């Protein structure tokens, strides 16, 4: 069964709106094959009330992963995370292949890029969603993501340190396998 936009919002809203939560945005990017594009665009145009909504970037590809739902917003609705010329492709493919939660290196959020405040001060956690009954051969349905700023994470850690918990940060980038 497909996830309705209202169900996605109902799940995401408490995550983002908690007072002590560093999560800024949640999103779902739906996996599409070329024959599914027209139906997807028709549904998304009705949902967004934007008759001109399209995939970004345009063009023919073997598969697509456009931003479909988001909370509190989807600033670049329809952006294909599998597009060759976007910086998200490698980390999205990694999330799909690992079938585990993955985290980006420090990155600038799309929302900040649009507003002209493009600092690499955020992380995005991603989890691939699979369902053998509804999708292509490997069951891939899409990606769910949570975006949060580093300052928000640090404020959480600072808060917990007052309650007797302590953390140690270390640079472990040399341990990442590419």
Residue ranges and their predicted role:
Residues 2-178:
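Intrinsically disordered, low-complexity polar/acidic regions
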